[in-house]
Amino acid sequence: MRVVILGSGVFGVASAWYLSQAGHDVTVIDRQPGPAEETSAANAGQISPGYAAPWAAPGVPLKAIKWMFQRHAPLAIGLDGTSFQLKWMWQMLRNCDTRHYMENKGRMVRLAEYSRDCLKALRDTTGIQYEGRQGGTLQLFRTAKQYENATRDIAVLEDAGVPYQLLEAKRLAEVEPALAEVSHKLTGGLRLPNDETGDCQLFTTRLAAMADQAGVTFRFNTAVDALLHEGDRIAGVKCGMRIIKGDAYVMAFGSYSTAMLKGLVDIPVYPLKGYSLTIPIAQEDGAPVSTILDVTYTIAITRFDQRIRVGGMAEIVGFNKTLLQPRRETLEMVVRDLFPRGGHVEQATFWTGLRPMTPDGTPVVGRTAYKNLWLNTGHGTLGWTMACGSGQLISDLISGRTPAIPYDDLAVARYSPGFTPARPQHLHGAHN
């Protein structure tokens, strides 16, 4: 089957890899000169299924009001003048209750756990290197309340069969030795030993090279003008004067998927702006070993080989990609506070990207009302975590194979009134 994939970020490339391995003739189209040039370029670098959770959570509306008056707030809102943004925020607000939070988190953990298994299998099969580490991740608490609230997430982890360790402050240095110097600032942490880290751009670039060798065609520097349709099928992709045709099409344009699908499929995917710093290592014994997630500021600090990646924050401001100095100062403040000897912060590279986010936090992966159009977008801040599993899922569905995990509630149809999953829903996913 000829499959055309729109987008060469980690989702487009992962989809291309798995589809090519399934025997399909795959073409990838992207306006950029190479893979992973946008959202996949400099994300936080964590592969953390256990921390998979929607931003729409109990208490977030009140916190959002408080954050409006804080200098180092993890969330900021700026009206972009569109009714779509207002509708999206209203939908997000409706998901900020315990029932929706647990349901959405369950979906996210299921896909994320499966995705990590797929990544491991890919790594074992191909030997792909991407400065990855399998040292687990550590969520840090600065208040007693944060430590107590961890029990809510632990319930979901236990239901999903995810190993964890709840650590008091004095034990944090057992897994991250450099934290011994700042343990007095912390109340404890939640460690997930099975989580991983890695450079998403490096992974995507190398997987794209492997896919190219396997026969995948990459059409870079190619802007897509429109999807053409005839009846209930997509007829081609218009790129300037050229029309590229296939038997099946996969939309993996990230935040730009919504506009490209306008008039065809309505998806509630909105850009969530995030920032990162990439910092050269200064002192080895003062740097993190794996990934730290500071709950107070929702900022991740990740160790690559000789670099530290500091990423986080969320701005609901549309497609504005301006690099704001106050956001850089927040990232610098957190990494200096936790790892004062770790990196040469003054030499850091500052970056921003737009994560494609749904109001319920769960990505949109699966079929549409068009018989040959599939979606792989909306993964928000967990794109790297969910990439391989989503690519394998798309490949299975297009190939007519039964996926290894329940998938009906990941498709766009879940936003339709009266939607009921066709398969029993549970959290165990890849553990079945």
UniProtKB/Swiss-Prot annotation:
Q: What is this protein called?
A: D-amino acid dehydrogenase
Q: Which reaction does it catalyse?
A: a D-alpha-amino acid + A + H2O = a 2-oxocarboxylate + AH2 + NH4(+)
EC class of this enzyme?
oxidoreductase
Q: Which SUPFAM superfamilies match?
A: FAD-linked reductases, C-terminal domain, FAD/NAD(P)-binding domain
Function summary: Catalyzes the oxidative deamination of D-amino acids. Participates in the utilization of alanine as the sole source of carbon and nitrogen for growth.
Q: Which UniProt keywords apply?
A: FAD, Flavoprotein, Oxidoreductase
Q: Residues that bind FAD, according to the entry?
A: 3-17
Looking at the keywords, is Oxidoreductase present? yes
* A GO term for molecular function: D-amino-acid dehydrogenase activity
Q: Return the Gene3D superfamilies for the record.
A: D-Amino Acid Oxidase, subunit A, domain 2, FAD/NAD(P)-binding domain
GO BP, one example? D-alanine catabolic process
- Asked if the record carries the keyword Glycoprotein, the reply is no
Which Pfam family, any one of them, does this sequence belong to?
DAO
Per the record, the similarity remark reads: Belongs to the DadA oxidoreductase family.
Q: Induction of this protein: by what?
A: By alanine; slightly repressed by glucose. Is activated by the Ntr system, mediated by the nitrogen assimilation control protein (NAC).
Which EC number(s) does the record attach to this protein?
Answer: 1.4.99.-
Q: What happens when the gene is disrupted?
A: Cells lacking this gene fail to use alanine as a carbon or nitrogen source and become sensitive to the presence of the amino acid in glucose-ammonium minimal medium. They exhibit a glutamate auxotrophy when ammonium is the sole source of nitrogen.
Cofactor(s) the record lists: FAD
Q: In which pathway does this enzyme or protein participate?
A: Amino-acid degradation; D-alanine degradation; NH(3) and pyruvate from D-alanine: step 1/1
Its cellular-component GO annotations read: cytoplasm; plasma membrane
